[in-house]
Amino acid sequence: LPLSYGVVCVLGLCLNVVALYIFLCRLKTWNASTTYMFHLAVSDSLYAASLPLLVYYYAQGDHWPFSTVLCKLVRFLFYTNL
């Protein structure tokens, strides 16, 4: 599980940053599908950003050394973006 989350994190962050750059810097006109794709890239970026902490959690044998607030935030980002 940590390996797959790590791959998804790296690819997800890199490719979504490229997509966000294209949406924000290259596209001149937006329509409904462009807005949808932009929001999808933002959502996927938030999901991918939550994965490094989950990789650490699972690699340490289900031990969460961070705060309870951070735990809830990571789980919120993870589950709302599935």
From Swiss-Prot:
Membrane topology reported for the UniProt record: Multi-pass membrane protein
Free-text tissue specificity from the UniProt record: Expressed in brain, heart, stria vascularis and vestibular labyrinth.
Record keywords, A-Z: Cell membrane, G-protein coupled receptor, Membrane, Receptor, Transducer, Transmembrane, Transmembrane helix
Transmembrane feature ranges: 1-25, 36-56, 76-82
Main localization of the protein described in the UniProt heading: membrane
Molecular function in Gene Ontology: A1 adenosine receptor binding; G protein-coupled UTP receptor activity
Record's GO cellular component terms: plasma membrane
Cytoplasmic side: 26-35
Described purpose of this protein according to its UniProt entry: Receptor for ATP and UTP coupled to G-proteins that activate a phosphatidylinositol-calcium second messenger system. Not activated by UDP.
Name listed for the protein in its UniProt record: P2Y purinoceptor 2
Lineage: Eukaryota, Metazoa, Chordata, Craniata, Vertebrata
